[in-house]
Regions:
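Acyl-donor (CoA/ACP) binding surface of acyl/acetyltransferases
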Residues: 1-35, 65-175
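Conserved GNAT-fold acetyl-CoA-binding loop/helix
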Residues: 34-55
Length: 175
């Protein structure tokens, strides 16, 4: 697949992080609706979610959504997002990732997060990349550790407590 003008494409050894194709957006909506509650705060507005995914592949106002592609098939999605009601300092990006259930445990989340983190530091002037996760999400916590992130405290948001993981530019460069 060729990238459109200005679209972000990140290539790894097995994965390609790329813009979602229009035909893939409904599938991503269904994946969101069927998400494990451990992974999301709440289901977003469908129209707004789909509109955001139509801008996939472009970093716009702190938001970037990319498909996680394995051999031409979408196996998940990775994103930066702006948390509702919480301002991020300049150069700080919050990240979310979701993989299809059938491909978990094979290192794809680790590779996607490493590729995305590196791209944010290299191309988006990131100083800090962080992500909240549910304390019970042991697989995601392990992925953060494998990629060099560390737990940086807790955050209470939307009535839930989240563990915050992060990595700074200096930590990324020193790994």
């Amino acid at each position: 697949m060729d990238a459109g003008p200005g679209e972000i494409v990140i290539r790894g050894s097995r994965l390609l992080l790329r813009a979602l194709r229009p035909a893939e957006i409904d599938g991503q909506w269904q994946a969101m609706v069927n998400s494990d509650p451990i992974a999301i705060v709440r289901i977003p507005d469908e129209a707004g979610f789909k509109a955001r995914l139509r801008r996939s592949g472009q970093l716009v106002d702190g938001w970037l959504d990319l498909a996680i592609d394995l051999d031409g098939a979408v196996i998940g999605r990775i994103q930066t997002f702006v948390p509702e009601g919480r301002r991020l300092p300049p150069g700080t990006f919050d990240v979310g990732i979701g993989l299809d259930e059938g491909v978990r445990g094979k290192g794809y989340g680790r590779e996607a997060l490493a590729l995305f983190t590196g791209w944010l530091f290299e191309h988006a002037a990131a100083q800090v990349v962080e992500a909240p996760t549910d304390p019970g999400n042991a697989p995601m916590r392990a992925v953060f550790g494998h990629v060099g992130w560390s737990q940086a405290g807790t955050l209470t948001e939307h009535g839930r407590e989240w563990l915050m993981y992060r990595i700074t530019r200096q930590e990324w460069q020193a790994r």
